Protein backbone atom coordinates (compact mmCIF):
# COMPACT_ATOMS: atom_id res chain seq x y z
CA UNK A 1 0.00 0.00 0.00
CA UNK A 2 1.15 3.50 -0.75
CA UNK A 3 3.24 5.87 1.29
CA UNK A 4 1.02 8.63 -0.01
CA UNK A 5 -1.95 7.30 1.95
CA UNK A 6 0.16 6.86 5.07
CA UNK A 7 1.49 10.40 4.78
CA UNK A 8 -2.02 11.82 4.39
CA UNK A 9 -3.02 10.27 7.71
CA UNK A 10 -0.42 12.30 9.64
CA UNK A 11 -2.57 15.23 10.76
CA UNK A 12 -1.59 17.25 13.87
CA UNK A 13 -4.48 17.21 16.31
CA UNK A 14 -6.17 14.30 14.48
CA UNK A 15 -3.63 11.59 15.27
CA UNK A 16 -3.15 8.30 13.51
CA UNK A 17 -3.29 5.62 16.23
CA UNK A 18 -0.96 2.67 15.66
CA UNK A 19 -1.55 -0.49 17.72
CA UNK A 20 1.79 -2.15 16.90
CA UNK A 21 1.71 -5.72 15.59
CA UNK A 22 4.32 -8.47 15.69
CA UNK A 23 3.15 -10.99 13.09
CA UNK A 24 0.61 -11.44 10.30
CA UNK A 25 -2.20 -12.56 12.60
CA UNK A 26 -1.86 -9.66 15.04
CA UNK A 27 -1.75 -7.35 12.00
CA UNK A 28 -5.02 -8.84 10.77
CA UNK A 29 -6.60 -8.10 14.16
CA UNK A 30 -5.47 -4.46 13.91
CA UNK A 31 -7.13 -4.13 10.51
CA UNK A 32 -10.29 -6.00 11.58
CA UNK A 33 -10.66 -3.48 14.43
CA UNK A 34 -10.79 -0.69 11.85
CA UNK A 35 -7.32 0.82 12.09
CA UNK A 36 -6.12 2.15 8.71
CA UNK A 37 -2.41 1.39 9.14
CA UNK A 38 -0.33 -1.40 10.69
CA UNK A 39 2.97 -0.69 12.42
CA UNK A 40 5.43 -3.23 13.74
CA UNK A 41 7.20 -3.13 17.09
CA UNK A 42 10.79 -4.36 16.77
CA UNK A 43 10.81 -5.52 20.39
CA UNK A 44 7.58 -7.50 19.97
CA UNK A 45 8.70 -9.02 16.65
CA UNK A 46 12.04 -10.00 18.18
CA UNK A 47 10.38 -11.54 21.25
CA UNK A 48 7.97 -13.56 19.09
CA UNK A 49 10.99 -14.92 17.21
CA UNK A 50 12.87 -15.74 20.42
CA UNK A 51 15.25 -12.78 20.57
CA UNK A 52 15.91 -9.81 22.81
CA UNK A 53 15.34 -6.31 21.43
CA UNK A 54 18.24 -4.24 20.13
CA UNK A 55 18.93 -5.76 16.69
CA UNK A 56 19.50 -9.27 18.04
CA UNK A 57 17.16 -10.53 15.31
CA UNK A 58 18.65 -10.74 11.82
CA UNK A 59 17.46 -8.33 9.13
CA UNK A 60 16.38 -11.33 7.04
CA UNK A 61 14.03 -12.49 9.79
CA UNK A 62 12.71 -9.01 10.53
CA UNK A 63 11.98 -8.22 6.90
CA UNK A 64 10.43 -11.65 6.40
CA UNK A 65 7.89 -10.77 9.10
CA UNK A 66 7.24 -7.43 7.38
CA UNK A 67 6.66 -9.15 4.04
CA UNK A 68 4.29 -11.66 5.64
CA UNK A 69 2.30 -8.79 7.13
CA UNK A 70 2.00 -6.86 3.85
CA UNK A 71 0.85 -10.08 2.16
CA UNK A 72 -1.81 -10.58 4.84
CA UNK A 73 -3.37 -7.11 5.05
CA UNK A 74 -4.50 -4.48 2.58
CA UNK A 75 -3.49 -1.36 4.51
CA UNK A 76 -0.13 0.45 4.63
CA UNK A 77 2.59 -1.04 6.82
CA UNK A 78 5.25 0.98 8.60
CA UNK A 79 8.19 -1.07 9.84
CA UNK A 80 10.31 -0.52 12.95
CA UNK A 81 13.84 -1.06 11.59
CA UNK A 82 15.56 -0.01 14.84
CA UNK A 83 18.80 1.73 13.79
CA UNK A 84 19.06 -0.06 10.45
CA UNK A 85 20.67 -3.42 11.33
CA UNK A 86 24.05 -2.26 10.05
CA UNK A 87 22.71 -2.01 6.50
CA UNK A 88 23.66 0.81 4.18
CA UNK A 89 20.98 3.34 3.28
CA UNK A 90 20.62 1.72 -0.14
CA UNK A 91 20.33 -1.77 1.33
CA UNK A 92 17.78 -0.56 3.87
CA UNK A 93 15.74 1.16 1.17
CA UNK A 94 15.83 -1.94 -1.02
CA UNK A 95 14.76 -4.26 1.81
CA UNK A 96 11.84 -2.00 2.72
CA UNK A 97 10.74 -1.85 -0.91
CA UNK A 98 10.96 -5.64 -1.24
CA UNK A 99 8.70 -5.97 1.82
CA UNK A 100 6.24 -3.49 0.25
CA UNK A 101 6.52 -1.22 3.29
CA UNK A 102 4.99 2.24 3.12
CA UNK A 103 7.03 3.63 5.98
CA UNK A 104 9.65 2.96 8.64
CA UNK A 105 10.98 4.09 12.00
CA UNK A 106 14.72 4.72 12.21
CA UNK A 107 16.15 5.45 15.66
CA UNK A 108 19.23 7.52 16.44
CA UNK A 109 20.82 5.03 18.83
CA UNK A 110 23.19 2.80 16.85
CA UNK A 111 22.35 -0.67 18.16
CA UNK A 112 25.29 -2.27 16.38
CA UNK A 113 27.81 -0.01 18.11
CA UNK A 114 25.92 0.63 21.33
CA UNK A 115 26.08 4.41 21.13
CA UNK A 116 23.99 7.42 20.24
CA UNK A 117 24.66 8.76 16.77
CA UNK A 118 25.57 12.42 16.49
CA UNK A 119 22.96 14.77 15.08
CA UNK A 120 24.87 15.15 11.82
CA UNK A 121 25.53 11.42 11.49
CA UNK A 122 21.91 10.40 11.89
CA UNK A 123 20.67 13.24 9.70
CA UNK A 124 23.02 12.02 6.96
CA UNK A 125 21.61 8.49 7.21
CA UNK A 126 18.05 9.78 6.98
CA UNK A 127 18.95 11.93 3.98
CA UNK A 128 20.54 8.94 2.26
CA UNK A 129 17.48 6.77 2.84
CA UNK A 130 15.19 9.50 1.52
CA UNK A 131 17.42 10.00 -1.50
CA UNK A 132 16.95 6.36 -2.43
CA UNK A 133 13.23 6.17 -1.58
CA UNK A 134 11.89 9.66 -2.15
CA UNK A 135 8.17 9.96 -1.54
CA UNK A 136 7.72 6.18 -1.75
CA UNK A 137 8.58 5.84 1.95
CA UNK A 138 7.35 7.73 5.02
CA UNK A 139 10.35 8.06 7.33
CA UNK A 140 9.61 8.47 11.03
CA UNK A 141 12.79 9.64 12.76
CA UNK A 142 12.90 8.30 16.31
CA UNK A 143 14.65 10.54 18.82
CA UNK A 144 16.03 8.79 21.90
CA UNK A 145 16.78 11.90 23.97
CA UNK A 146 14.13 11.11 26.59
CA UNK A 147 15.01 7.45 27.16
CA UNK A 148 16.23 7.11 30.73
CA UNK A 149 15.21 10.66 31.65
CA UNK A 150 14.49 10.92 35.38
CA UNK A 151 10.99 12.34 35.74
CA UNK A 152 9.67 15.64 34.38
CA UNK A 153 12.86 17.51 35.31
CA UNK A 154 14.97 15.00 33.43
CA UNK A 155 12.69 15.24 30.41
CA UNK A 156 12.87 19.03 30.47
CA UNK A 157 16.67 18.83 30.56
CA UNK A 158 16.57 16.55 27.50
CA UNK A 159 14.22 18.82 25.54
CA UNK A 160 16.82 21.07 23.84
CA UNK A 161 18.71 18.07 22.45
CA UNK A 162 15.46 16.51 21.23
CA UNK A 163 14.36 19.70 19.47
CA UNK A 164 17.78 20.19 17.86
CA UNK A 165 17.72 16.64 16.56
CA UNK A 166 14.13 16.93 15.35
CA UNK A 167 14.86 20.03 13.30
CA UNK A 168 17.97 18.46 11.78
CA UNK A 169 16.14 15.23 10.93
CA UNK A 170 13.26 17.13 9.34
CA UNK A 171 15.72 19.19 7.31
CA UNK A 172 17.27 15.89 6.17
CA UNK A 173 13.91 14.76 4.79
CA UNK A 174 12.20 12.92 7.64
CA UNK A 175 8.42 13.01 7.32
CA UNK A 176 7.70 12.73 11.04
CA UNK A 177 9.70 12.91 14.28
CA UNK A 178 9.26 10.57 17.22
CA UNK A 179 10.48 11.66 20.68
CA UNK A 180 9.89 8.24 22.17
CA UNK A 181 8.65 7.72 25.75
CA UNK A 182 7.89 11.30 26.78
CA UNK A 183 5.68 11.07 29.84
CA UNK A 184 5.33 14.75 30.71
CA UNK A 185 2.43 16.36 28.83
CA UNK A 186 4.00 19.78 29.35
CA UNK A 187 7.35 18.75 27.85
CA UNK A 188 5.71 16.94 24.95
CA UNK A 189 3.52 19.97 24.26
CA UNK A 190 6.58 22.21 24.12
CA UNK A 191 8.31 19.79 21.76
CA UNK A 192 5.28 19.80 19.44
CA UNK A 193 5.23 23.60 19.46
CA UNK A 194 8.97 23.87 18.77
CA UNK A 195 8.82 21.66 15.66
CA UNK A 196 5.39 22.75 14.38
CA UNK A 197 3.94 22.26 11.81
CA UNK A 198 5.89 19.01 11.40
CA UNK A 199 4.05 15.80 12.39
CA UNK A 200 5.04 14.42 15.79
CA UNK A 201 4.71 10.78 16.89
CA UNK A 202 4.06 10.17 20.60
CA UNK A 203 4.07 6.97 22.65
CA UNK A 204 0.86 5.98 24.43
CA UNK A 205 2.09 4.79 27.83
CA UNK A 206 0.21 3.64 30.96
CA UNK A 207 1.90 6.40 32.98
CA UNK A 208 1.82 9.07 30.28
CA UNK A 209 -0.79 11.33 28.67
CA UNK A 210 -3.94 9.54 27.54
CA UNK A 211 -5.33 9.59 24.00
CA UNK A 212 -7.44 12.69 24.63
CA UNK A 213 -4.48 14.63 26.01
CA UNK A 214 -2.14 13.50 23.22
CA UNK A 215 -4.72 14.71 20.71
CA UNK A 216 -5.05 18.04 22.53
CA UNK A 217 -1.26 18.46 22.47
CA UNK A 218 -1.36 18.30 18.69
CA UNK A 219 0.51 15.10 17.93
CA UNK A 220 -0.11 13.54 14.51
CA UNK A 221 0.66 9.92 15.31
CA UNK A 222 0.38 7.72 18.41
CA UNK A 223 2.24 4.43 18.84
CA UNK A 224 1.56 1.77 21.43
CA UNK A 225 4.99 0.17 21.00
CA UNK A 226 5.05 -3.13 22.87
CA UNK A 227 1.79 -2.30 24.66
CA UNK A 228 -0.50 -4.75 22.85
CA UNK A 229 2.10 -7.51 22.86
CA UNK A 230 2.52 -7.11 26.63
CA UNK A 231 -1.25 -7.23 27.12
CA UNK A 232 -1.54 -10.37 24.97
CA UNK A 233 1.33 -12.00 26.82
CA UNK A 234 -0.21 -11.17 30.20
CA UNK A 235 -3.56 -12.66 29.16
CA UNK A 236 -1.91 -15.86 27.96
CA UNK A 237 0.15 -16.08 31.16
CA UNK A 238 -2.99 -15.68 33.29
CA UNK A 239 -4.80 -18.38 31.30
CA UNK A 240 -1.86 -20.76 31.72
CA UNK A 241 -1.76 -20.10 35.46
CA UNK A 242 -5.46 -20.95 35.71
CA UNK A 243 -4.94 -24.13 33.71
CA UNK A 244 -1.98 -25.14 35.89
CA UNK A 245 -4.18 -24.65 38.97
CA UNK A 246 -6.82 -26.93 37.48
CA UNK A 247 -9.31 -24.18 36.76
CA UNK A 248 -10.74 -23.07 33.44
CA UNK A 249 -8.51 -20.74 31.43
CA UNK A 250 -11.53 -19.52 29.44
Residues covered by each model-derived region:
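Glycine-rich, proline-tolerant flexible connector loops at the mouths of alpha/beta enzymes
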Residues: 37-63, 83, 87, 105-122, ...
